[in-house]
C-alpha cells in the first residue's frame, strides 16, 4: 500500500517514461517505467527519502534517454501520487 510519494512523466524523442519516488510498506523506493514497452527501466530501488528517490529516478531516466534517444531529460514536474 502506498503511503506517500510523487511521480513525473517524460515524453522526449518518441520515448514515454514515468518516474516514481514513493514510500510504501517496503520503505522508500525509486523506479522508472517505460510506458511504450510496458517495462521497468529501473525497478524499485531502496532510497533514504522521497527527495533522494526523485534524484535517483531522474538519474536513471537521464542515462536511459541519452543512451536510446540521444536526448536530454527535460525539467520535471513532480505530482503527488494517489494513496490507496
Predicted features along the sequence, with ranges:
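Short N-terminal "domain-start" leader segments
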Residues: 1-29, 83
Amino acid at each position: 500500500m502506498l503511503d506517500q510519494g510523487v511521480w513525473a512523466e517524460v515524453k522526449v524523442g518518441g520515448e514515454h517514461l514515468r518516474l516514481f519516488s514513493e514510500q510504501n510498506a517496503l520503505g522508500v523506493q525509486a523506479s522508472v517505467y517505460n510506458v511504450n514497452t510496458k517495462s521497468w527501466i529501473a525497478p524499485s530501488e531502496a532510497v533514504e527519502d522521497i527527495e533522494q528517490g526523485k534524484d535517483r529516478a531522474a538519474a536513471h531516466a537521464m542515462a536511459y534517454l541519452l543512451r536510446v534517444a540521444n536526448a536530454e531529460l527535460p525539467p520535471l514536474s513532480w505530482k503527488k501520487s494517489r494513496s490507496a
